[in-house]
Amino acid sequence: AAPTATVTPSSGLSDGTVVKVAGAGLQAGTAYDVGQCAWVDTGVLACNPADFSSVTADANGSASTSLTVRRSFEGFLFDGTRWGTVDCTTAACQVGLSDAAGNGPEGVAISFN
């Protein structure tokens, strides 16, 4: 089965809310970066490395951690290029998990008050 992610809560968020991020169907024993990102252009994802968290999937391919989400953040591309300020009240922000190769479940959309 394809890997899945859940974020609780995922809507009605305030700046600095701590959400629970869980993954299932992940590669057992693989480390995943957990972070908040936004599609800022077609195929371009800018993320917030300042609040990244890391988690390793257990033998069943499950993982869970907490993450602080921001209404706006300093966005960086995967190659480390600074994108600029991302405002989640206008951008499509999400929380996701990805391994070192960029593989992981689809990101979960989040929304702020």
UniProtKB/Swiss-Prot annotation:
Disulphide bridges, residue numbers: C37-C47, C88-C93
Pfam families membership: Neocarzinostat
Record family assignment: Belongs to the neocarzinostatin family.
Keyword Ligase: no
GO molecular function: DNA binding
Functional note: NCS has antibiotic activity (for Gram-positive bacteria) and antitumor activity (for certain mouse tumors). NCS binds non-covalently to a chromophore which is the cytotoxic and mutagenic component of the antibiotic. The chromophore binds to DNA as a weak intercalator and causes single- and double-strand breaks.
Keyword Cell wall biogenesis/degradation: no
InterPro entries for the chain: Neocarzinostatin-like, Neocarzinostatin_fam
Protein name from the UniProt record: Neocarzinostatin
Gene name as annotated: ncsA
UniProt keyword terms in alphabetical order: Antibiotic, Antimicrobial, Disulfide bond, DNA-binding
Domain of life: Bacteria
NCBIfam families per UniProt: chromo_anti
Native source organism of the sequence: Streptomyces malayensis
Annotated GO biological process: defense response to bacterium
